[in-house]
Amino acid sequence: MPHIDIKCFPRELDEQQKAALAADITDVIIRHLNSKDSSISIALQQIQPESWQAIWDAEIAPQMEALIKKPGYSM
């Protein structure tokens, strides 16, 4: 705890880039939430652009009030 679930359009990330992303996010979570490294998990799911509406409908729009960073777009 915490678990971070990143969804994005497909990116060409190799394992080294994924590890660097995870390390950077982990450092931020440790600094701001006072978490232990061993408590943090991070998922990276690459979603095709034509499938993004489903993510918006299920995960973004219903939680708009809870988002600490709101998107600059709407669907």
UniProtKB/Swiss-Prot annotation:
Oligomeric form and interacting partners: Homodimer.
Gene label: pptA
Active site: residue positions: P2 (proton acceptor)
Keyword annotations of the record: Cytoplasm, Isomerase
Name the record gives this protein: Tautomerase PptA
Record's GO cellular component terms: cytoplasm
GO MF term set: intramolecular oxidoreductase activity, interconverting keto- and enol-groups
Superkingdom of source: Bacteria
Enzyme Commission number, as recorded: 5.3.2.-
Group of enzyme by EC: isomerase
Family statement drawn from the similarity comment of this UniProt entry: Belongs to the 4-oxalocrotonate tautomerase family. PptA subfamily.
